[in-house]
Amino acid sequence: MATIAFSRLSIYFCVLLLCHGSMAQLFGPNVNPWHNPRQGGFRECRFDRLQAFEPLRRVRSEAGVTEYFDEKNEQFQCTGTFVIRRVIEPQGLLVPRYSNTPGMVYIIQGRGSMGLTFPGCPATYQQQFQQFLPEGQSQSQKFRDEHQKIHQFRQGDIVALPAGVAHWFYNEGDAPVVALYVFDLNNNANQLEPRQKEFLLAGNNNREQQMYGRSIEQHSGQNIFSGFNNELLSEALGVNALVAKRLQGQNDQRGEIIRVKNGLKLLRPAFAQQQEQAQQQEQAQAQYQVQYSEEQQPSTRCNGLDENFCTIKARLNIENPSHADTYNPRAGRITRLNSQKFPILNLVQLSATRVNLYQNAILSPFWNVNAHSLVYIVQGHARVQVVSNLGKTVFNGVLRPGQLLIIPQHYVVLKKAEHEGCQYISFKTNANSMVSHLAGKNSIFRAMPVDVIANAYRISREQARSLKNNRGEELGAFTPRYQQQTYPGFSNESENEALE
């Protein structure tokens, strides 16, 4: 009997431990920087010559332009990334769509409203309004509209776009909205082929596309309703055949960015209510733990949709100086955005770093430990060198605004701002990206014994001690100590132009 009781007790504790581990996986935060749920990475890739990219082709719509970087280039394919830049003119609406891959949007300039439609979440915005008809016609009855939350965006915002979540953007300002999109094709959320696919819910892409420096081609793409039979569609949605045809976008030549003639009439709370909502959202975010692995784990006590999921913040500003992680008043500031600050990034599995370098400031040489990096120059110019595992320079040039450089994982990079300074944003293919610095506080030299450094480089102990400590407590952005008139290692323009 004692043996049976002991066996039952052992089984009980084993089950308890297993349940505890499963619950931790389900509801614990996915903040392990060494784990990244990405596919691919096994193909042979050559990163022996990097190049600065600019948009290769553009598609014009009624109220804006979509510019595509060269997704067929080996560097984009090897890193599993897809990049576009969109310009939305005032009163322009980017029609609703969703994508097979998760992504991030960086608002380079402009402001407006956007909506992300999460499945299963309630419509928390409600309004009633009276529609007035022209004189001589009777007034229609009151209509009630309700929808999910509308977000306001502005310059410097990062917007997370989970795979399969419908979204739209609207420019309600007086200046064009310019936004950079980065998508992760190798994310496990994408179970299709490693290509970017946008599923339009409205509009179409039946517009001419222009290849920069090449001939004009025709780009064809319809919205998802166009493939259904008109009668079946009208029956399924409970609308007449004419409305069904409108849904299918027949004879609609406006493209994917359309102009709203009289502007969108959007419901939004008063300023005080917005502040209250923001506070509630921050409280919910502090308590929220993203359940990224839940889809792959069986559960009988929940349906995969946490209450806080519907209120999770999908937008965060990365240019706010008060959010800087490191700041040197003579060199610049660095702001990092990862899943610990922005929990929805656990669903997207991307992160971002915004760097503002002052005049002639230099960034501590570093490598990305657990991610590829896509660097986009926002303002100013930067001298950049990238070195491979063979000690060879694979990029050596000056990046200008609008250019993008892919830096492979573990490749060492050195950046120096020119006289007007430099601002750039880098996207990392890990929700909690890590870097390892070569100089300054928390660098690898500071972590090594003096004798190791002296013997490794055949220098004296005094020289090794100076190498180890000469940047003192500086971290990230450095003020240059040794001014030179020329930089023979750099070229005025990128030496790594696109190979056409």
Swiss-Prot record:
Disulfide bonds join C45-C78, C121-C310. Residues 481-493 have a biased composition (Polar residues). The keyword Signal applies. Transmembrane segments: none annotated. One of its GO terms (biological process) is seed development. Seed storage protein. PANTHER family: 12S SEED STORAGE PROTEIN CRB, OS03G0336100 PROTEIN-RELATED. This is Glutelin type-B 4. It comes from Oryza sativa subsp. japonica (Rice). The gene is GLUB4.
